[in-house]
């Protein structure tokens, strides 16, 4: 699963996930992409599950790029523990996603196969997504 090798601080404030994606909102590597239409959090498990289902669909033909990285730690306190006594331990890592962010890119397959693979991947994700193609200038 994806997670940072090391961070400056172990735990992070919750923060707010506002605004639109102004970085990573264009296709830069492949021909086709999967773009987020809503904001949300994408866990490292969800990123990996979507990657695996896409890889299985396209077999060996395609190159897939993952354009998001889970760099935010989410903490949790154990069950039946009283309030206080500090922040809980890190349970999992998430990537915060804004609308317009390209999540995955693909190259080396035809559009029909890419669209089917991205539909399977979108079923694993917690927000609405859209299939996009690279515009040729």
Swiss-Prot record:
The keyword rRNA-binding applies. This is Large ribosomal subunit protein uL16. PROSITE patterns: RIBOSOMAL_L16_1, RIBOSOMAL_L16_2. The gene is rplP. Belongs to the universal ribosomal protein uL16 family. One of its GO terms (molecular function) is tRNA binding. Keywords: Ribonucleoprotein, Ribosomal protein, RNA-binding, rRNA-binding, tRNA-binding. It comes from the Bacteria. Part of the 50S ribosomal subunit. Pfam families: Ribosomal_L16. SUPFAM superfamilies: Ribosomal protein L16p/L10e. It comes from Hydrogenovibrio crunogenus (strain DSM 25203 / XCL-2). PANTHER family: 50S/60S RIBOSOMAL PROTEIN L16, LARGE RIBOSOMAL SUBUNIT PROTEIN UL16M. InterPro entries: Ribosomal_uL16, Ribosomal_uL16_bact-type, Ribosomal_uL16_CS, Ribosomal_uL16_dom, Ribosomal_uL16_sf. The keyword Cell division does not apply. Binds 23S rRNA and is also seen to make contacts with the A and possibly P site tRNAs. GO terms for biological process: translation. GO terms for cellular component: cytosolic large ribosomal subunit.
